[in-house]
Amino acid sequence: MAFNYDRERHRKDGKQGRLIGQPIVLTIIWICWALFVGWLNCWLTAGIRATIDWFHSPDSYQFLNGQVNAQVFAILSNGWQTANLGNYQVMRSNPLIFAVIELIGAGVMLPLVIKTWLKWRPNHGNQYGNDRLTTEDEVLVQYPQIPDRGFEYDGVGGIPVSHIKATAPVFLKHHPVTWLRYYFAPEVSQLATRLPMLKNALPFVEPAKGFYSIDQTTVNSLIVGITRSGKGETLVMPLVDILSRGSEKCSMVVNDPKGELYQMSYETLRKRGYNVQVLNLQNTDFSMSYNPLQQIISFAKEGYYDETQQAVNTLSSSIYVDPNAKDKFWQNSSINLLNALILAVVDYAKRNDRWDEVTMDNVLHMMTELGSKQVNVNASGDIVPSAEELMADKSLKMPSDSSIAGQKNKLLVYFAQMQKLNEKHYSQFRQMALDSFAQSKFAGDETSGNIYSSAMEGIKIYQQSNIAKLTSKNSVNFESIGFPRTMRFRLPERYKFKTAVIEIDDDSGKKLEKRTQIVDKVGMLNYAIKAKLPDDFTIKIDFDYRKNEPDYRDAKLVVTGRKLYQRNGFTAHSFKRDPYTHQPLLKEVKLTIKQNELAGDVAEMKMDYSESPVALFLVTPPNNPSYNQLPAFAVDQIFNTIYSTALANGRKSFTRVHFLLDEFGNLPPISHMDTKVSIGLGQNLLFDIIVQNLEQLQINYSQQQADTIESNCANLLYILTESKKTAETISAKIGKRTVNVQTSSGKMGDVHGISFSNQFISQDIMSMNDLMKLMGGEMVVLRSVYRQDQKGHSVAAMPIFDHGQTAMPFRYTFLRHEFNDQMTLSDIGIKSPHRSLDLKALRINYDSAYNQLLELMDGG
């Protein structure tokens, strides 16, 4: 079927009717004509020679004198007799006459041959387009080849651009060793195990069904495929498998609508050493906990004021930003109001050291409990509670001036008291909250109600108790996705902005790694560890660096580290082991100061250690798209966290991270997504974006942003679409070729009146209709920056058309063991810290918080 389809597709170029225009054919015709002329030339040469001889003979004089007899024309008769046709002895006796006639006779045919060649010559595609598709041989030479299942391979993973069957002769021609190792040898071994004597002697190894050509370069990819086009079966699932089989395993952040990919791949990924996490918004009781304010909490606790404000603004902008909105007033007011509320909660947490209460649930209730109520106030702006309110809530207090001067919104009163307190006891977080509140225009009588409604619309999902619980705890460390091993030391303040030299040695003194790192503005030394550490190791930190002042260079800190494992008993090797990898489970890494020659104590030491890449699945319910706000937050925060850590640790994440964003059009706008796809590659952060058509990019992003996202995806993998605009765009990018079109005209039955004409035209290599009718497994790959083969030779990045023996296989035909579609949530032990959480126990009492503001003012 596929062969006939290809033959029908390529029949458009008209090559079948151009045999007469081939130079070899025209040369043969001309040679045949020359031979015919030579054959006839023998007779003409003999006749002409005889005629010349006759004029010089006595017979001609006798004829001219009227003496005619039978012998007068004997010479002429012998010369012009038909027996001389093909008599090449004449050529030897009369070479000059023969040559002249031969040249004239053969030359007569040349104009006709040349005219025929000009009319019927094959088109080589230079006049109106000379684009073409990449050949199978070129794909096999240009890309790394890996087995399509089972086997580990060298290097990092990459998106598959083609697949070829193991039995294809062209693959054996280019990669005989790979073919023998992954197909022939396992096939022979599998046959041998059928023999009774060898059944248990040889390991059972499944041979590869074929081989993938993968792009291991650091590029973004855009995948286009409508629903039910097979993109999950032919690309998404195989990509997860490929990324997890490389010797340098990649971390993955996968948007997984419905959660099927998470359930199917969990067991395989765990066996391959992955730390598999899931943010399950479809069933929050079987999900990790994710507090979108956790990054803000971390910055605020450590005293990073600017970073806290930036993280707050990024989060708020992610909720309310609409690049296609014409009136930005309500959008900006909502952003500033939410900024103010979050920072006010941060200020409360800092005052009371209750950081676990910095949650979106408390932010929401600050808005609902304070922003929706009007209260009586006195002339100073203090709340004057009624007698009933005093009886109902003992925490309320009557101000000294209990006369009612009017009513105000309770949220305005709260921030007014924050302003008064800040004038007496300055807090930077409090000032940030006040600045944002002032910018929100909430204090305006005419706009406050609309701003309140607009702001509530963006965070109403946190009214759902399941979402409120999930976002009130946090059980994932985003930094570990790109940097699985990190350590931090809070050093004395005098070392701020100094360059530290960090060296890590094993217990024998062998150096594992050494690098410089700057102590940041709060005195924190954050360091990402690239090497995998032994059970016992030593960390040496000194300031003997040329850019440090001399009086700092003698400072030194030596710390010993030891891995502590979870135990089942008291024997030396009674460790708890991972049920999938069978490796001991790490409990913690204990750090002990061995030598401190710093000018002060080390206030904090901590190491987060893992040797596992992370696979984080973001399960989004298709029937409740409002929940997709959280995965969008997660993608943004993961990128920002890893990006900033990478800049401080060699500019690249130690583990390559693939953001595999299926159904990208259903996700809310990810903050600065156009910038992320532009700058992320330098930090080893790759995006694989999947849409149903190119227009989907413009649903949540402006035209300019959508164009930037598309142009920064070096690979465009097209599977199928129903969008004519998308198909036309893809067709134009594939290119055009020149074809010769023949037309005929004439009346029916008039054989001699038919005329033919030829015209060169430009034709799409693959038309819009061709692209909208691709068969299952067929795929077009547009690549823009892949311009070197495996040997470093420059190549042209021609489009690839996967079809026939290079069609992409479906997952269920060869990856059933790796992706078990029978696995369900009940088979996976998911621990959810928030499952039994009491929301009320974490909720802030804002009346008490208000009274605290008053007490702090009075106490000041």
Please give the residue ranges for each predicted region.
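Basic- and hydrophobic-enriched, low-structure N-terminal and domain-boundary segments
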Residues: 1-229, 233-241, 246-248, 285, ...
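Switch/coupling segment of Walker-type NTPase motor domains
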Residues: 192-344
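Loop/turn-to-beta-strand initiation segments
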Residues: 249-251, 613-615, 655-658, 683-688
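Helical/strand "switch-coupling" subdomains that flank nucleotide/phosphate-binding cores, especially
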Residues: 281-469, 480-486, 490-501, 506-513, ...
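Conserved P-loop NTPase motor module
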Residues: 450, 454, 486, 490-491, ...
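Conserved helicase/translocase P-loop NTPase motor core
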Residues: 450-484, 489-494, 592-657
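Conserved ATP-driven motor cores of ASCE-family P-loop NTPases powering translocation/secretion/packaging/pilus
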Residues: 579, 583, 677-679, 683-780
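Conserved P-loop NTPase "ATPase switch" module shared by AAA+ and STAND
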Residues: 653-669
